[in-house]
C-alpha cells in the first residue's frame, strides 16, 4: 500500500 501511494503521489507531482 505504501509503495502504491508513493507512486500515485509522485505521478501527481
UniProtKB/Swiss-Prot annotation:
The lineage of its organism: Eukaryota, Metazoa, Chordata, Craniata, Vertebrata. Has no antibacterial activity. Has hemolytic activity. The modification Leucine amide is found at residue 13. It comes from the Eukaryota. Disulfide bonds: none annotated. Belongs to the frog skin active peptide (FSAP) family. Temporin subfamily. Expressed by the skin glands. This is Temporin-1Td. GO terms for cellular component: extracellular region. The keyword Lyase does not apply. GO terms for biological process: defense response to bacterium; innate immune response; killing of cells of another organism. Keywords: Amidation, Amphibian defense peptide, Antibiotic, Antimicrobial, Cytolysis, Hemolysis, Immunity, Innate immunity, Secreted. The keyword Secreted applies. Signal peptide: none annotated. It is found in: Secreted.
Amino acid at each position: 500500500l505504501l509503495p502504491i501511494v508513493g507512486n500515485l503521489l509522485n505521478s501527481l507531482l
